[in-house]
Swiss-Prot record:
The gene is ldhD. It catalyses: (R)-lactate + NAD(+) = pyruvate + NADH + H(+). NAD(+) binds at R155, I156, D175, M206, P207, N212, M233, A234, R235, D259. The keyword NAD applies. The active site is at R235, E264, H296. SUPFAM superfamilies: Formate/glycerate dehydrogenase catalytic domain-like (SSF52283), NAD(P)-binding Rossmann-fold domains (SSF51735). Gene3D superfamilies: NAD(P)-binding Rossmann-like Domain (3.40.50.720). This is D-lactate dehydrogenase. Keywords: NAD, Oxidoreductase.
Length: 330
């Protein structure tokens, strides 16, 4: 059995090679993305694993079919970068890694919240200037006194809710699919609007859909409790970014922790040090004084990276051997 891996970073290569040695499977790695040009490198291979970031070119699906390759294993939970209908038309199974480390994202969410409510960024800036004074700009809030709204109560949302509950927060939530596990931790509300209206902190953990694209916009921000904090560790497209910046400037929101940006594809995960960022909206977001922006790094732990690599490769092997897998999404 031979597998081709695309978009492989150095640290992932080490893990993939160990997995291959442990399982007696031949693999070929490339840092290059999967494109109509590079897909030709998969000729003669049995399966593909890929860490796709932006939309996959539609021309790739029929090319894979011609090669006899029947799947693409994505190294993430989200698969919005794939045309699932076109994949199905070409007998290509797309798989994901649905649960690689919910705790990694949950812990990161709470880390950023604590930084925001205790003004850690400002304190560090002051200290570098040898300003050691106390005053209102750095006076913080107690997390346990806050009401938290979790929007999206799947694995990650639930893990996040549990941590906030452990701090003593009142936790409410909304999801179109309510779970018994979440009901033990939070109080479900019947709508997003009802969940957010009294929340000091709103934390987003839902998958991207056509229905929730730009759901968090100027109209919804007006329904927030004045001075609330917004956290987005989900997908960038659920927020209308300019409306978020306007809400921060107007004082409707007091802060935001943003790990994903709708148009991050050209920038993440790349080093742009010393280069010009031409996306003016992205520049405004990352430089806003009330925003802590992180480059889609909430998931990024040893455990998560290992689980993503191995999860994608295991799914590839399972499809080759059996024709299907439990992690298929089409």
């Amino acid at each position: 059995m031979k597998l081709k891996l695309y978009n492989v970073r150095g640290e992932e290569a080490v893990l993939a090679k160990k997995w291959a040695d442990d399982n007696g499977i031949e693999i070929s790695l490339t840092e290059s993305p999967l494109t109509p040009e590079t897909v030709k490198e998969a000729e003669g291979f049995d399966g593909i694993a890929n860490a796709q970031i932006g939309p996959l070119d539609d021309a790739i699906y029929p090319l894979l079919k011609e090669m006899g390759i029947k799947q693409i294993a994505q190294h993430s939970a989200s698969v919005d970068m794939y045309n699932l209908d076109l994949a199905t038309e070409n007998d290509i199974i797309i798989t994901n890694v649905p649960s690689y480390s919910p705790e990694s994202i949950a812990e990161f969410t709470v880390t950023i919240v604590l930084n925001l409510i205790r003004h850690v960024e400002l304190i560090r800036e002051n200290v570098k200037k040898q300003n050691f004074t106390w005053g209102l700009p750095i006076r913080g809030r107690v997390l346990g006194d806050m009401t938290v709204a979790i929007i999206g109560t799947g694995r990650i949302g639930l893990a996040t809710a549990k941590i906030f509950k452990g701090f003593g927060c009142k936790v409410v939530g909304y999801d179109i699919y309510q779970s018994d596990a979440a009901k033990a931790v939070l109080d479900y509300k019947e709508s997003v609007e009802e969940a957010i209206k009294d929340a000091d902190l709103v934390s987003l953990h839902m998958p991207p859909t056509a229905e929730n694209t730009h759901l968090f916009n100027s109209d919804l921000f007006k329904s927030f409790k004045k001075g609330a904090i917004l956290m987005n560790m989900a997908r960038g497209a659920v927020i209308e970014t300019q409306d978020l910046l306007d809400a921060l400037d107007a004082g409707l929101l007091s802060g935001a922790g943003i790990d994903t940006y709708e148009f991050e594809g050209p920038y993440i995960p790349k080093n742009f040090e010393g280069q010009e960022i031409t996306d003016s909206l992205f520049k405004a977001l990352i430089n806003h004084p009330k925003v802590i922006y992180t480059p889609h790094a909430a998931y990024y732990t040893d455990e998560a990276v290992k689980n993503l690599v191995e999860g994608a490769l295991n799914a590839t092997v399972e499809i080759i051997k059996t024709g299907t897998t439990t992690t298929r999404v089409n």
